[in-house]
Amino acid sequence: MSTLLKLTPSIPDWLSLEIANRMMEKLTIIKLQAEHIFHSGSVQLGLMHKRFPKARHYCSNAKLEHSSIQRLLLQLLRRPSVQFHSTDALRPQHLMDLVWSNLELQHHDQPELLVQSWERLLKPESLLMFAYLGPDTGKELRVIDGASEPIAGAWDMHDVGDALLKSGFAEPVMDMEYITLEYEHPDLLLKDAIELGLVVEKGSDLIKANHELAPLKMTLEVVYGHAWTPERRLSKSHDGVAKIAVDQILRSK
């Protein structure tokens, strides 16, 4: 029997920080002044604070929110804090200058809904920047029948580009890279695979029993993307029907 008690997907801290640094390198070539930043997924306040020292930070995970006393103390220390912000579609949105999503999309069974929530958060002419794990992640584990499966929301990057356009984003740019992790022991590989949500129920026992079938390495397909919200949200397509927001209708002069 496996001694692992849960197979809940998460992201190892070392991986989220590594990908955040790679995203930040891509952000350096983009001209952006951000006062309000929403974190979707892993939160790296220190890293973002270096680029946007005056920005306020928000996230949808209430567990990560700093209390009012903590925020006051951090303000006195000139360090960033994070506040909770709902992504509820019924609440007023379009408040953010930047949505930063580090390794979140692949955790969603319906990733298109997450893309739509990002669009609701952003002001006109604001930036979405994200990274997620693509469908080739953990492909080495699939040689062991019944032990692993692709991550639920590991979309092909072209499908994500289409979802961005359908949700009202403009100028989407997508690229990807492969990162190969090598391990000295099967247990170390298994630990990371479980954290990433690659191992199905009872899969850990199968991998341990048949580890000689799979190499001691794991591929991460990391997909990066960014897109802008247009100056005016003129229309959106839903089920083949274009809708025009009332506040976007211009009177002819």
Q: What is the meaning of each model-derived region?
A:
Residues 96-112, 116, 132:
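A short SAM/SAH-binding and catalytic strip from SAM-dependent methyltransferases
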Residues 24, 28, 167, 187-253:
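C-terminal lobe and adjacent flexible extensions of AdoMet/dcAdoMet transferase-like proteins
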Residues 49, 55, 136-140, 216:
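Terminal, non-globular segments
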Residues 125-186, 196-205:
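Conserved catalytic/acceptor-binding region of the Class I
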Residues 1-34:
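Class I SAM-dependent methyltransferase Rossmann-like catalytic core
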Residues 1-11, 71, 75-76, 250-253:
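Eukaryotic N-terminal low-complexity, Ser/Thr- and Lys/Arg-rich leader segments
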Residues 112-127:
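A short glycine-rich, Lys/Arg-flanked "PGG" loop and its adjoining helix->strand segment in the class I
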Residues 24-93, 98, 112-113:
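Class I SAM-dependent methyltransferase SAM/SAH-binding core
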